[in-house]
Swiss-Prot record:
<dbReference type="InterPro" id="IPR017930">
    <property type="entry name" value="Myb_dom"/>
</dbReference>
<comment type="subunit">
    <text>Homodimer and heterodimer with TRP1.</text>
</comment>
<comment type="function">
    <text>Binds specifically to the plant telomeric double-stranded DNA sequences. At least 2 repeats of telomeric sequences are required for binding. Induces DNA bending.</text>
</comment>
<feature type="DNA-binding region" description="H-T-H motif">
    <location>
        <begin position="532"/>
        <end position="559"/>
    </location>
</feature>
<dbReference type="InterPro" id="IPR031105">
    <property type="entry name" value="TRP_plant"/>
</dbReference>
<dbReference type="GO" id="GO:0042162">
    <property type="term" value="F:telomeric DNA binding"/>
</dbReference>
<dbReference type="InterPro" id="IPR001005">
    <property type="entry name" value="SANT/Myb"/>
</dbReference>
<dbReference type="InterPro" id="IPR029071">
    <property type="entry name" value="Ubiquitin-like_domsf"/>
</dbReference>
<feature type="region of interest" description="Disordered">
    <location>
        <begin position="593"/>
        <end position="619"/>
    </location>
</feature>
<keyword id="KW-0238">DNA-binding</keyword>
<dbReference type="GO" id="GO:0005634">
    <property type="term" value="C:nucleus"/>
</dbReference>
<feature type="domain" description="Ubiquitin-like">
    <location>
        <begin position="324"/>
        <end position="403"/>
    </location>
</feature>
<dbReference type="GO" id="GO:0008301">
    <property type="term" value="F:DNA binding, bending"/>
</dbReference>
<keyword id="KW-0804">Transcription</keyword>
<feature type="domain" description="HTH myb-type">
    <location>
        <begin position="504"/>
        <end position="563"/>
    </location>
</feature>
<protein>
    <recommendedName>
        <fullName>Telomere repeat-binding protein 3</fullName>
    </recommendedName>
</protein>
<dbReference type="Pfam" id="PF23603">
    <property type="entry name" value="Ubiquitin_TPR1"/>
</dbReference>
Length: 619
């Protein structure tokens, strides 16, 4: 069903404000009542309650009793209005008050009504109470003359904030009926919008007009405030323009000005949270938007809103990168071999292990990283490239302690190094040649580099009886080593297991030469095809790179090569004469293999050779 608006037809050069609709339940009841009592009026108007009020006012003009009650209530209203005006002038207002020029025949009246919970309240309310509730009285007018229940006279200047008048109705009656009364301006019985010209807003609200800002502060450093827009009547706009503006406002957010102020003067005011259904029928300028301001850790304010929020007003916090938290429980150390007697005590075993570890780590240590049991050697890779992240299972990550490689090279040249002149460096000399103690002058001329290599540089530990004050220019500093204590037990640290590269390498392919093929054929003719170890000892005893398996494989290759045509043969060529001998020996030993195994091989090789000649096999 389409609701027909009747505001445009009553327009006399200005637009009426939109009246908020009642809930659907109340509107449904009003519709049913109007259909039952008035069959002629079939159209539904949005301001039925305002029309009902007009009818009641017309009835009040004809009734003298109602006019008398009206005069009594008027006097009470005038007294209340004076007290309110005096209080408002003393307190002041944070929002500027615009000035309006109003003729002497104009007065300000409350004439916009809120809907009650049901229409039964209005039906049971007498005329005098109805006028008393809705405040159909003038506020502080001069030249008081009663005419049709209204006062005529010149209204005072600055009657309210933004053209609004303070409600002077009795609060007890309003509370009893549960009604709310929005304010508007009535001029001569007709509603008019206040003039928006020559308005002087406050400086703190330069970009927001004449608004009211209320707020409340909680104990948890959260600030809640809602910004109530003023009830200014806008100029008339066609439904098409309103529909376009509504669609545009839903697609794009509006920018919140940077100099937006948050006033906390009214601390005791509660924030108003509206639901969607309660805002039904309101225009965009009548809605109250609730803003929420909280403090972020970096002391910057973040503004959020229940109505509309500017995307530029939210400060994004910097995103922290993902960190990897490691919990190292143990380190792996290289394997150590320690020899101790069975009669040794546990304390001596501990000392021995401690000494072994000290010797291992005396030259410095370095940390190794193991991932899935494999050592990570590239130190320039990132943790994510290596596979170390907070999402992965860090149980596959390990660390090792390794001795740092020796950085001091062993000088094997015979050139004389520079003699240090600092006396402190002389005490750090670790060893000297045995010839230094023999008293032979110029002993360094006797030392040869070849002798040093052959003797593996047996160095004597540093002797404490050598005088530091009398340095000898003939001595040579070979390798600086720290002072070692000689122990009875030998400690041999094992750094790494040696890699056997020679076993891991693939064997080099060595093809048989013609001489080796001839020796193989001759040995097979004499010994047969089932004694390959004897063939190895007979013909290839000195050839370590030839095994009996190699000889057997080569014999099979020769038999296959001799049985095919010369065009199909591959590899190094073999003389045809040798291939013919291979075929004759293969045929002979294949026929007599069982008979020779039963009789046993003869110890004399010349007899076997003679048997081969008798069978027609040529050597």
């Amino acid at each position: 069903m389409v609701f027909k608006r009747k505001l445009d037809c009553l327009s006399v050069g200005f637009d009426f404000p939109n009246i908020p609709r009642a809930p659907r339940s109340c509107r449904r009841k009003v519709l049913n009542k109007r259909i039952d009592h008035d069959d002629d009026n079939t159209q539904i108007c949005a301001i039925d309650l305002l029309a009902l009020a007009g009818k009641i006012l017309q009835e009040s003009e004809s009734s003298s009793a109602s006019s008398n009650a009206f005069e009594e209530i008027k006097q009470e209203k005038v007294e209340n209005c004076k007290t309110i005006k005096s209080e408002s002038s003393d307190q002041g207002n944070s929002v500027s008050k615009p000035t309006y020029d109003i003729s002497t025949e104009k007065c300000v009246v409350n004439s916009c009504f809120s809907f009650p919970d049901s229409d039964g309240v209005l039906e049971r309310t007498p005329m005098s109470d109805y006028k008393k509730i809705h405040g159909l009285m003038d506020v502080g007018c001069e030249n008081k003359n009663v005419n049709n229940g209204f006062e005529q006279g010149e209204a005072t200047d600055r009657v309210g904030d933004g053209g609004l008048v303070t409600d002077t109705c009795n609060l007890e009656d309003a509370t009893a009926l549960g009604l709310q009364f929005p304010k508007s301006v009535c001029v001569g019985g007709d509603l008019k919008s206040p003039s928006t010209l020559d308005m002087t807003p406050n400086g703190s609200y330069a970009r927001h007009g004449n608004h009211t800002n209320l707020g409340r502060k909680d104990d948890d450093e959260k600030f809640y405030s809602y910004h109530k827009l003023s009830n200014k009547f806008k100029s008339y706009r066609s439904p098409t323009i309103r529909r376009i503006r509504k669609s545009m406002s839903s697609k794009y957010w509006k920018q919140v000005p940077k100099d937006f102020g948050y006033s906390r003067a009214d601390v005791g005011v509660k924030t108003l949270y509206r639901k969607r259904k309660s805002c039904y029928g309101y225009n965009a300028w009548q809605r109250e938007i609730i803003y929420k301001r909280r403090r972020s850790p970096d002391r910057s304010s973040v503004v959020t809103s229940d109505g509309g929020l500017s995307s530029g007003s939210v400060s994004k916090l910097p995103k922290k990168g993902d960190t990897v938290k490691l919990s190292i429980k143990s380190f792996r150390i290289p394997e150590l071999f320690i020899e101790v007697p069975e009669t040794a005590t546990v304390g001596s075993l501990k000392r021995t292990v401690m000494e072994a570890v000290s010797v291992l780590l005396s030259g410095g240590i370095r940390v190794g990283v193991l991932m899935h049991g494999k050592k990570v050697r590239d130190e320039r890779k990132t943790l994510s490239q290596t596979g170390i992240s907070c999402d992965e299972n860090l149980d596959n990550l390990g660390f090792t302690l390794e001795p740092s490689p020796s950085k001091v090279p062993l000088p094997l040249c015979s050139e004389d190094p520079a003699v240090p002149t600092d006396p402190t460096s002389l005490s750090e000399r670790s060893a000297a040649s045995p010839m230094l103690d023999s008293g032979i002058p110029h002993a360094d001329d006797v030392i040869d580099s070849r002798n040093i290599v052959d003797s593996n540089l047996e160095l004597v530990p540093y002797q404490g009886d050598i005088s530091v004050d009398e340095p000898s220019s003939d001595s040579k500093e070979l390798v600086p080593l720290p002072e070692l204590e000689v122990k009875a037990l030998a400690i041999v640290p094992l750094n790494q297991k040696p890699k056997r590269t020679e076993l891991a390498q693939r064997r080099t392919r060595r093809p048989f030469s013609v001489t080796e093929v001839e020796a193989l054929v001759q040995a097979v003719e004499e010994l047969g095809t089932g004694r390959w170890r004897d063939v190895k000892l007979r013909a290839f005893e000195d050839a370590d790179h030839r095994t009996y398996v190699d000889l057997k494989d080569k014999w099979k290759t020769l038999v296959h090569t001799a049985s095919i045509s010369p065009q199909q043969r591959r590899g190094e060529p073999v003389p045809q004469e040798l291939l013919d001998r291979v075929l004759r020996a293969y045929g002979y030993w294949s026929q007599h293999q069982g008979k020779h195994q039963a009789r046993g091989a003869s110890k004399d090789p010349d007899m076997n050779r003679g048997g081969a000649f008798e069978s027609g096999v040529s050597v």
